[in-house]
Amino acid sequence: MKNILVISASPRKGGNSDVLCDEFIKGAQQAGHKVEKIFLRNFKVNYCTGCGVCNSTHKCVQKDDMAEIMDKMVNADVIVFATPVYFYTMDAQLKTLIDRTVPRYTEMVNKEVYYILTAADTNAANLEKTVESIRGFTLDCLDGAVEKGILYGTGVWDKGEVHMKTAYEMGLHS
């Protein structure tokens, strides 16, 4: 049994990336894994100020919910990053989360990672910039991270226009 953390960065409750997270979770639970989903919109996560204190203390001086989220990331075997794609990159919520991991990202080792991306664009190749920016964190900064799957929810503008079966199967095989 794996401990899976699904991070939904969507600012819209019930949006397409949220719905795909839920399908991934159904598959992962069917496979017997323990899954927790967090909605970044429900947490207070301030922007990184670049003060540099965390480089020596491994703690952020800001008083918000980021320490709780980092605990979950450190303890997870699998992390799923789900984001809508805005102007060909991840949304601000996910970027802020990634920026704020500096105090503890070296503790996030040997993680399996999945990406769920949703966009109005119909061409998955146009989302590669988004994937590369997330990989800049997961594969370049997290020791031993292994990319296990990417779901491109393309051509989805309105809520509900998503690739449900693919998300379920990705979770089932996590």
Question: Which residues are covered by each model-predicted region?
Answer:
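Short, glycine-/small-residue-rich phosphate/pyrophosphate-handling segment
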Residues: 92, 105-148
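N-terminal beta1-alpha1-beta2 submodule of the flavodoxin-like/Rossmannoid cofactor-binding fold
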Residues: 1-82, 88-104, 146, 152, ...
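Short glycine-rich anion-binding loops that position phosphate/pyrophosphate groups of nucleotides
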Residues: 85-87, 120-121
